[in-house]
Amino acid sequence: MKKNLLFVALLLAMSLSASAQYKGFSFGFKLGPNFDWVGSKTGAAINQGTKTGFDVGVVAEYYFAENYAIVTGVSVDFLKGQYNFEDMRNISAIDTITDYQLGTVGRQFKTTVYEIPLMLKMVTPQLGNLPLRAYAQVGGAFGYTQRVKVMDTFTLGDINDTDFRATKGEYNPFHASLRIGAGAEYTLLETTRVFAGLYFSHDFLNSISRGGLVSSNYEKYYGGDKELGEREFKLNVLQNRIGIEFGIFF
């Protein structure tokens, strides 16, 4: 994580120290679908397929050289995910009696993230006689998770209980990711361009909040018959996504 952050910071520092001969600002809008999945450094959280979300936002870019720009903005990202993990749950129907059993928890979640990207954009010269240019971007994004909806399904033999819903407090409110992308832009008028691109985003921060996973139904994280410690360290859920974006600059 530290090496990735250092790499991004170095790129941005180099770009800011470059010549300011080609200064210029552009503003615009973008939107598009994203395809989300989760990873886990420990392997304790097992991804259960790719989910489809959506991004929408405003973008701004500052050209500090003819073919180089700093890109930022604000986006609202609607993200989804699903993963399984083993854990103990109290399955007793009597309040005064506890009966913790090891089963499989299937977790589905939806989050709304307000995100500010900070990217270095590198653009090619015009391709042939067409007003078309290709670009690549690298940088990071930082945001805040405003809303989380989570549903857990606990499975143990014939038991399939979907009543328990995790709370927002179980998820980290802060969001930071590495992002790379590429695409093309087409000039319609002197100051108007449309663009389409593809990007990949990988989280730096564990999505599970420290200390947020203690509830009346779950104890500490379990694997097999051994207690492995606090769940936020063992699950270590990282959000990944590939997005397609379409937009316009004015």
Functional labels for PLM-detected ranges:
Residues 20-25, 67, 125-133, 188-193:
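Short loop/turn motifs that connect adjacent beta-strands in outer-membrane beta-barrel proteins
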Residues 20-59, 241, 247-250:
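Short glycine/proline- and aromatic-enriched beta-strand/turn motifs that initiate or cap beta-hairpins
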Residues 25, 50-54, 110-114, 132, ...:
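Residues that define the transmembrane beta-barrel architecture of outer-membrane proteins
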Residues 29-33, 56-62, 74-76, 116-122, ...:
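Residues on the lipid-exposed face of transmembrane beta-strands in outer-membrane beta-barrel proteins
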Residues 39-45, 82-89, 147-159, 208-215:
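Outer-membrane beta-barrel translocator domains and adjoining extracellular loop/strand segments
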Residues 41-47, 101-107, 163-170, 228-234:
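Extracellular loop and loop/strand-boundary signature of outer-membrane beta-barrel proteins
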Residues 46-101, 114, 248:
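Glycine- and aromatic-enriched membrane insertion/assembly motifs of diderm outer-membrane
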Residues 175, 180, 185-250:
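Predominantly the C-terminal beta-signal and adjacent terminal strand-loop region
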